[in-house]
Amino acid sequence: MQKFVKNVKKQTVLLSTRAIAAQIILQVLDQGKSLSTLIPDTQHQVKTQDLPLLQEICFGVCRVLPRLELIIKQLVDKPLKGKTRIVHCLLLVGLYQLLYTRIPAHAAVDEVVNATTALKAEHFRGLVNGVLRRFLREQETLLVKVDKHWHTLHPDWLVNRLKEAYPNWREIVEANNHKPPMWLRVNQQKNSTETYRTLLAEQGIEAEKADNPCALRLLQPVAVSQLPAFHEGAVSVQDVNAQWSALLLAPENGELILDACAAPGGKTTHILEQAPQAHVVALDVEATRLKRVHENLARMQQQATVICGDATQPAQWLKQLSESAVQFDRILLDAPCSATGVIRRHPDIKWLRQASDISALVALQKQILQALWTVLKPNGILLYATCSVLPEENALQIEQFLTNNVDAKLEPLPFTAVEGSVGYQFLPTENGGDGFYYAKLRKVVS
C-alpha cells in the first residue's frame, strides 16, 4: 500500500478520526473494499464517542462523492495521484464536514489539517489548510459553478440502466441520495408489534407502524443498546421490505427449510420467529460471514443448522445433513445481486459496482436457482429475493426460469402489481423501505 496509508487491520494505536476516515475512503475508491467491512475492522481505533462521526463521514462522502470531486477540481491545480491520493481523500473528508455537518468550520479545518501528521503527510499540511480555507472564502461562488447542472450523484452506467427501466428514475436516484430510516422487526414470539411500540414509547422512542405486521419505523434512529430487550431477542434491526422474505415464504412448524445465502442471518432468525419448530438450514459460501449468523441465532435464542457451502453445488453440502435424500419443503433464495436497491444504506455500492458486474451476477443467480430447484420437494415453495432494482436480475431472470422449467409455477403475492408483471418490485421511493424484489415459485407435480 502507499507510503502514507497504514494497513487498517494492523493499526495498534489510536489515530485521528479524520485520518482513519481518509484511509477508509481511499480503500473504498482505489481498492474496491466495502464500508461494511472496513468500518468494523477499524472501529477499535477510534474513541467510542467518535464512532458515529467516523460512520457519518465515510458514508456521507460516498453518498455525495461526485459533488465533492467537482469542488476539489476547482480548488486544486494538479490532481493528487499516486502516493498523494491519501491527501485527496483527506480533502474529501474536510469538504464533507464543511458542507454537511454542524461542526464549526474552524474546528473542522483544524482537525483535518492535524490529520496530515497522523498520515505521515505533514508536508501537505499547508496545501490542505489552504484548500479548505479557500473553499470557505469562495464557497458561494464555487457551489454555483459546481451545482449549475442537476447531478445524480450516481455513476453514469447506473443512471442509464435506471432510465431504461423506470419512467420515475429521477425519484429513485433522489431516494438513493437520502439517509434511510431505521426499521425494527418485532419478534412476535415475545411481543406483539403494538406492545413493543408501547415499550419504546416508555423509553421516549417514537415509532410508527407499517403495512408489514412485524415492522416499526423509528422517527429518529437510536443505538441498539437503547432498544428494550434487544439483547434478549425481542427485536431486530431490519428494513421493512427485507422483512417480507420470511412472511412471503410462510414457513410452517415441522418443515425442512433452506435459507440459501443466509449471512448475516436476519432472515434465518425471522423464519424461526414465524415457525419456531421448523428445521432451518442456513447456508452461505463465506465462512467468515457465518459467524454473524451464529451471533444472531444466539441473541435470538434460536437453533438452526449452519453450513458453509456453495449454493450452486448442493451435493457437496447436503451430505452434512443427517437426513437422507434431502429435499426441502421451502427454500428462501436471497440471491447474490448488485445491491442497487440498498444504495441508501450502502452508498459505497455506487462506486464499488461496475456495469460489467451485472452479467456475471445474472449468470450466478441463474446457476443457483437451477441448482436449488433440484433439492425442492414436489409442491414445495422457492422464494426468490434480491435487493436489486435492475430488471435483468429480477423479473427477467424469473421469466427465463419459468420458460426453462415447466414444473415451475408463479404464485401470487399480496401486493398490487402492474398487470402481467412477474413477481413484485419494491422501489426505495414507495414506503420508506429499500428496493427489493420477490417472486414466489411452486414446484408443480406433473
UniProtKB/Swiss-Prot annotation:
Q: Which residues form a coiled coil?
A: none
Q: Does the keyword Transferase apply?
A: yes
Report keywords, A-Z: Cytoplasm, Methyltransferase, Ribosome biogenesis, RNA-binding, rRNA processing, S-adenosyl-L-methionine, Transferase
Compartment annotation: Cytoplasm
Q: What EC number(s) does this enzyme carry?
A: 2.1.1.176
- Give the catalytic activity: cytidine(967) in 16S rRNA + S-adenosyl-L-methionine = 5-methylcytidine(967) in 16S rRNA + S-adenosyl-L-homocysteine + H(+)
- EC main group: transferase
Q: Which GO terms describe its molecular function?
A: RNA binding; rRNA (cytosine-C5-)-methyltransferase activity
Indicate which residues the UniProt annotation says bind S-adenosyl-L-methionine: C261, A262, A263, P264, G265, G266, K267, D284, D310, D334
**Which Pfam families is this protein grouped with?**
Methyltr_RsmB-F (PF01189), NusB (PF01029), RsmF-B_ferredox (PF22458)
Q: Which domain of life is it from?
A: Bacteria
Tell me which GO cellular component terms the UniProt record holds.
Answer: cytosol
Q: Which residues form the active site?
A: C387
**What PROSITE patterns would the database entry show?**
NOL1_NOP2_SUN (PS01153), SAM_MT_RSMB_NOP (PS51686)
Output one GO BP term: regulation of DNA-templated transcription
Similarity section:
Belongs to the class I-like SAM-binding methyltransferase superfamily. RsmB/NOP family.
Free-text function comment from the UniProt entry: Specifically methylates the cytosine at position 967 (m5C967) of 16S rRNA.
Q: Any idea what this protein is called?
A: Ribosomal RNA small subunit methyltransferase B
Q: Which organism is it from?
A: Pasteurella multocida (strain Pm70)
